[in-house]
Curated annotation (Swiss-Prot):
Heterodimer of a 45 kDa and a 32 kDa subunit. Acts with RNA polymerase to initiate transcription from intermediate gene promoters. The lineage of its organism: Viruses, Varidnaviria, Bamfordvirae, Nucleocytoviricota, Pokkesviricetes. It comes from Camelpox virus (strain CMS). Signal peptide: none annotated. InterPro entries: Poxvirus_intermed-TF. This is Intermediate transcription factor 3 large subunit. The gene is VITF3L. It holds the Pfam family Pox_int_trans. Belongs to the poxviruses A23 family. Keywords: Activator, Transcription, Transcription regulation.
């Protein structure tokens, strides 16, 4: 980890990170983080009863548990704005909301109606304007006019699915769904699967998302703000997430080790100089501290922050290159999966930029109208 941050610091005058995803590999000695969090979230409907430690409340927006039988959101109401009457309601036509109408539940309903949550994304995805049922086309081919085509309503206690079809092309379906949602206090509950993955998610107020899988491996999607400047700010954001995450784990699984790690993490946060932060991170790696010793890069992107004032020559890019140009002038390096990958493509990017500058200078010095076609091909296509 310290080597990655050291290199990102070396190039931060030219490149800035955009997407940054990483994993914390599960450790048997830590315990069943997933199982204990699942138990706590499943049994409670008040945020304070899930997250006891009030010091970390401002950092956590909500927790989500999703498996085949249940999806449950526990929200921290204090992290949401007060809505006015003109605030846009996003999802009324997708959900039937049941609530006990208490003040707490009514506030949760208000938030749910206006937030673009994963439930809204899921129900929008499963509502399909047009879907071809190839099995029914096969019936038409082999069964003639007597083939049966389904249209109508299928429903259970929590999900109603309406299938409509055109009489002339009955194998083309329009599918619409409505989901029942129960809201009690800070909890938003629906039954059945509402996600591709079975995970626990912790959504931070800074938009970072932590996904915890069944084996307690974690996937962390680190958010990016416009005011993030250089590697030192990135380290502070990551370790701020660590600090609050580890205190949450200590709170829920009652393992004092996480409190100790949170204290070590806090030393990184309070250090003011980058060299000091990197030194502390290296020491954490040497002592096999959770969060550093089990850190593994998932994927990250870099963007070239300087302006490209010269002509861009796309022919210099390999077909499978991770160097991409967007809108003609924006250079990004995408899908980097290791420090070695990063060093390799930054080097290629630097060399390519120099070659483009040279070609651009030559191109600007010649008369395009009188120059030979072969010469122009050499400049533009090779």
């Amino acid at each position: 980890m310290d080597n990655l941050f050291t290199f990102l610091h070396e190039i931060e005058d030219r490149y800035a990170r955009t997407i940054f995803n990483f994993h914390l590999i599960s450790c048997d000695e830590i315990g069943d983080i997933y199982g204990l969090m699942k138990e706590r979230i499943s049994s409670e409907d008040m945020f304070d009863n899930v997250v006891y430690n009030k010091d970390i409340h401002p950092a956590i927006k909500k927790l989500v548990y999703c498996d085949i039988q249940l999806t449950k959101h526990i929200i921290n109401q204090n992290t949401y704005p007060v809505f006015n009457d003109s605030s846009q309601v996003k999802c009324c036509h997708y959900f039937d909301i049941n609530s006990d109408n208490s003040n707490i539940s009514s506030r949760t309903v208000e938030i749910f109606e206006r937030e673009k949550s994963s439930l809204v994304s899921y129900i929008k995805t499963t509502n399909k304007k047009r879907k071809v049922n190839y099995g029914e086309i096969k019936k038409t081919v082999h069964g003639g006019t007597n083939a049966n085509y389904f249209s109508g309503k299928k429903s259970d206690e929590y999900l109603s699915t309406t299938v409509r079809s055109n009489i002339n092309q009955p194998w083309i379906k329009t599918i619409s769904k409505r989901m029942r949602v129960d809201i009690i206090n800070h909890s938003i509950v629906t039954r059945g699967k509402s996600s591709i993955l079975q995970t626990i998610e912790i959504i931070f107020t800074n938009r970072t998302c932590v996904k915890i899988f069944k084996d307690s491996t974690m996937h962390i999607i680190l958010s990016k703000d416009n005011d993030e400047k250089g590697c030192i700010h990135m380290i502070d954001k990551l370790f701020y997430v660590y600090y609050n995450l580890f205190l949450l784990f200590e709170d829920i699984i009652q393992n004092e080790y996480f409190k100790e790690v949170a204290n070590v993490v806090n030393h990184v946060l309070t250090a003011t100089a980058l060299d000091e932060k990197l030194f502390l991170i290296k020491k954490m790696a040497e002592h096999d501290v959770y969060g550093v010793s089990n850190f593994k890069i998932g994927m990250f992107n870099l963007t070239f922050i300087k302006s490209l004032d010269h002509t861009v020559f796309p022919s210099l890019l390999d077909e499978d290159s991770k160097i991409k140009f967007f809108k003609g002038k924006k250079l990004n390096i995408v899908a980097l999966r290791s420090l070695e990958d990063c060093i390799n493509y930054v080097t290629k990017s630097e060399n390519m930029i120099e070659m483009m500058k040279e070609r651009s200078t030559i191109l600007n010095s010649i008369d395009i109208e009188t120059e030979s076609v072969d010469r122009l091909k050499d400049l533009l296509l090779k």
